[in-house]
Amino acid sequence: MTSFVSFLPELVLLAGALALFVVTLGQNNVRLARILSVATASGVLVAALATVNHSAVLFSGAYRVDAFSQLLKIAIAFGYLCVGILSGQLRDIRGEAKPEYFLFLALSMTGLLALVSSIDVITLIIALELSSFPLYLMVAMRREREGQRVQMESAIKYIMFGIAANGVMFFGFGYLYGLTGSTSLPVILEKLPPLLSSPLAVTGLALTLAGFLYKLAVFPFHFWTPDVYQGSSNETASLIASLPKLGAVAVLVRFVSLAAPGHETLATLLTCLAIASMVYGNLIALVQTDLKRLLGFSGIAHAGYVMVGFVAMDNFGFASALYYIAGYMLMVLACFVVVCQVSRDGANVAITELAGLHKRSPLLAVTLIVGVFALAGVPPFVGFMAKLNLLTSAWQAGHTALVVLTVINSAIAIYYYLQIVRAAFFAESDAQPAPIALTPSMSALCVLLIVAITLLGVAPAFTIDAITNSLATISTVSS
């Protein structure tokens, strides 16, 4: 019975996915599919909150429910609920595919929930593929515009890069299995650290990390990001930009913690990835005019910020990285709420189209400025506290140069974020733009994101302590 209750979030989500599958078999009932999707997300969030203190090892030791996994499931469920509400209209998804869109959304979330609890290579691979393949299909569901099939180009790029990254990752898993003789992460945790002086062990770990760095869009695994953001629908882009990255960071924490603290080779590799991602993402974002492409290149830079937390290779650094990516999920979702509402008929939004937003919808304007200022690291929002923790962890670990470069890159990023604010609050449109009417659910989502972003920045102690305490369960997996 305890095992059944511990598995409750996944069971609720599977039940919701089954109900959505039944809906897709009948008439094109988009409204019912939308209601079921939001209800499922709400149920998963309640179930995750109810089981936050549960622990269990399931499926012959391949699946572990602990404080670490359950805390992440709460964040994933909250993000799922936000995306479900955000996907209320799906203006740019083909009409006949809209019910299937919500089904694939549920299946992808099922994979993410399984990903954060998987402690065996086999279940990890299954969860990763389950979370990825529905996203490939969701990108391709965008309707054609003026004979262009940009959504198919984006989907093909996403699939091809994804398959290549997964192939490299599986190759790395093969090395780890050959060195340790097991697919169980607890066994690998026990046997791998003494072997890290071996080139094969370092190669295996590096290849394995490559697959998750692809999900996080870390340089040089970032090539797909701006094109997929631009080619997918606004709602799909909001999903790809947020939730999969949370799952990727969670698994990266499990793998990087395999290395002994102070392992110089891995720390140097992570430092190079962090610097390259920050510099490349911020410099290219400076010249973007399409808002989704700007958020895509900005996401590459933020992936570099996350890697700063991993460089410390201790629990404080890992907790800082998790706190940052959870905050980033909220920040980028706030920006995509504005993109979805400003967009005319689901089209991409240029920065200049934000002109007069403070008059068209004051609530959307506030949501945008909170999201953008948080991304820029302006207090009192979560982006400031999260970035401060990352810098502190790297400073304490002796990576002074990395801290300085991170601060410089953060200053560069402020320029293009202020361009967004300037367009929304100070630029005037040539024509008289119509007011943007928000539905009650969309207004509630805006308020929820504003409160969450502000609250996590003003009072971060509870969240950081919860994450830090949950990390202790990773080290006890082998016991």
Curated annotation (Swiss-Prot):
TM segment ranges: 4-24, 43-63, 67-87, 99-119, 121-141, 159-179, 201-221, 239-259, 267-287, 294-314, 318-338, 364-384, 401-421, 444-464
Cellular component, GO, one term: plasma membrane
Gene Ontology MF terms in the entry: NADH dehydrogenase (ubiquinone) activity; NADH:ubiquinone reductase (non-electrogenic) activity; quinone binding
Biological-process GO terms, alphabetical: ATP synthesis coupled electron transport
Keywords: Cell inner membrane, Cell membrane, Membrane, NAD, Quinone, Translocase, Transmembrane, Transmembrane helix, Transport, Ubiquinone
Compartments reported by the entry: Cell inner membrane
EC number: 7.1.1.-
Family, as annotated: Belongs to the complex I subunit 2 family.
Assembly: NDH-1 is composed of 14 different subunits. Subunits NuoA, H, J, K, L, M, N constitute the membrane sector of the complex.
HAMAP family: NDH1_NuoN_1
Function field: NDH-1 shuttles electrons from NADH, via FMN and iron-sulfur (Fe-S) centers, to quinones in the respiratory chain. The immediate electron acceptor for the enzyme in this species is believed to be ubiquinone. Couples the redox reaction to proton translocation (for every two electrons transferred, four hydrogen ions are translocated across the cytoplasmic membrane), and thus conserves the redox energy in a proton gradient.
Name under which the protein is recorded: NADH-quinone oxidoreductase subunit N 2
Species assigned in the record: Opitutus terrae (strain DSM 11246 / JCM 15787 / PB90-1)
